[in-house]
Structure formats: structure tokens, C-alpha cells
Amino acid sequence: MGTLKRAAALLLALFAAAAFAAEGDGTLLPHSQKSFEAYAQDARAYVEANRRWVTEGALRAAELEANLPHEYMPEHPDGRAILLVHGLGDSPFTFDEIARDLAKEGILVRTVLLPGCGTKPADMMKVTQEDWRRTVEEQAGLLRARSKSFWIGGYSMGGDLAIDYAARHPGEVKGLVLFSPAAAVRSRLAALAVPASHVRDWITAPEERPNGGQNPLQYLITPTKGLAAFYRTMTAAQEGLEKLEKDRWRGRWFAALAARDGLVKTEALLPQFQRIAKGTRSAFLWYGTFPKGADAAGTRALPDAIGELKIAGFSHMALTYSERNPFYGKQGTVRFCWNGQGKAESLACEKGADVCFSGDGQQPEGAGGCAKLTWNPYYGEQLKAILSVMAEP
């Protein structure tokens, strides 16, 4: 979802005279498997054959595993199960820590790899909203058949797909677990993704970015057709929320939202979630100053400025990773240093300078240049809240 920050540039795409050539071969991850095991095997073969690799040597095995769907089988399963869906251009690794922790509590967890993801940005050229919806539909059906209590959740666009699924299958879903769901974005120009996709393939082409616009875990650029598919998915989630509210859906909710999310209009989503969840066993975490006039019932606000950790705000992507995460944690190997500060500060950050951390593109006055926060210092408290909502009577 990091590429959505470029939505404003879509206006320029409408007046482009020429399009960049697509680099993908148009093939997508196979579907319609009869078991999760077959799906996971096909995904492995597909990623191995089509991925543009970022790492080399021994690290490549970890890069591969991070981009594959996985099943996390509890030692003592209790009938609960949850399907977790990653965001636009992201990977199933988004949920690796959360999935392991939920499995320890008896919950069967599966992740998916959305079509167009896990290989290279150009493979988003022919992906559609229906491709993503079909993957969720198929994998939810397989997991639901293995469970007594079926849940679905997601991060960013994956949250949109989870909401859409719940709205279309309200009687089959026990509840939703959402992290920064992108059902309302801040950019007023997001709708231009659809017309822009007909006149230009890229805003920033892969050859213009290091590693072709990706890191080991996610894409850093997305073709306009992928952004158009995202917009349609967001619209479906908005319609799904309206349906759930109108039908007075009684499923449970957990949602984690950041006040300074630079991509999602979280202050608009929180009251809508609260209305739908009223009277159910649900919980919401709000990272930052509570919105003026918002209903605090069922919602816990946690400070997003933590001086001793040099944290000035939470970003869109920070919520699903703990500070121990080997890639995105406090001492992780991946840093997002180009976060709106000056070039010199960004370069110093890349060289390992001691920096502060903030929300998407946010640079507090006098902070000296903040990298984007990529981990959640409240990860443990967040996990407890999720387990409380998912607990069986």
C-alpha cells in the first residue's frame, strides 16, 4: 500500500502522450485448487519461476518464503480459524508474527498471496479486482470447511477484501480483524486511477527505481492498472460497510487504526466501524490523539508519540510488525528513509544514522529527519485485544 501515496500524480497520467511498455508476461497465479496444500504448491512454483529476486545466496530462501502463502497449524486446535489477507503489492509476510502468535492460542491461521503480488510490479498489469476477490473467496471457502468459527482479516487493501467478503457472506463470518483497512483514502484524486490506467501504464517505471521498484517483501511502485483495481476494491469495501450497517450485522470487530495514517482516512472509518459493531463483543485500538467528538466506547487510544523510542507518529504499515521483526523491527534490515525529509537527511538515514520515526511523509518540526515507522511498540497489547475479541464463551 505504500505506493498509494503517489495517487496525486495520477492527474498527470491523464495527459500523458505515451505509455511505458509493460514488462509482465500477463500470467497470474493459478487458481481453483481443491485444497490449500495444492494452492500453496502452485504458488511456490509460480513465484520461483516469475519473481525478480532482490537478494542473493542464503537470503533468497527467506525472500521466497516471505512471499508465499502459509498455514500456521496450532498444536491444540480449538475450531477457530482465520484467513489473513495482505495489502496492495505486499506479501503474506505482513502477518507472519501475528499468525504464529494466534496459532499458539489454538487458532488455525492461513495467509494468501494475491494475484500480481510476490513476483514483480509489472505482473500487476493485468490483475483485476475480481482476481483478488476470487482468491479470497476460494481460500475462505476451504478454510471455513475446516473450522467451527471462521474469521477473516486483512491489512490495508486486504482489509477491504475482508470487509467485502463479510458483506457478501454475513452468516458465515464470526468476525473481522482489520489493520489500517483502506476503505477510505485521503487523496481526492484516487478515483483518477481508473481513467489513468487507460492512457499510461506507469507513474514511475521499474527501471527508474532501485531493484526494479521492490524490496524483498513488497513492491514500492504499482502500475496504474493495479491502482485502478485497488480503487474498485476500495469502492466495494465502502459498499460492503454500508450493507453491514443497513443489515445490522452482528459479527465481532477488531480494528487497529493510526491517527497519522498518511494514506487512509482513519478518522472517518472509526465512527462507521463503531456504529456497525455496537452491541457486539468488539474492540478498536486508536494510535494517536482521539478524534474530537468521537465516541470512546469500546475504543482504546494509545499515544503515538513516544519520546524514549524517538517515535513521533505511527505510519500506515507499522501496525502488524513487532519491534523484534527481523526486517521491519526496531533493529530490522529494511528502513524507509525517504519520508519527506531532505536528501542529505535521507542519505544519512540509509547509512545508519540515529533517526526518529514518524507517520507517512510526516516530518515534525525540529526532529532532524524521521524515517517511516515500520513496527508497533504496542504489538503485545494489540495481540491481547485481538485474542479478547476472538475468545469463545
Question: What are these model-derived regions, one by one?
Answer:
Residues 73-76, 221-365, 374-387:
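Serine-hydrolase catalytic core
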Residues 9-18:
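Bacterial N-terminal signal peptides
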Residues 65-114:
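Short, surface-exposed "cap/lid" segments of acyl-processing enzymes
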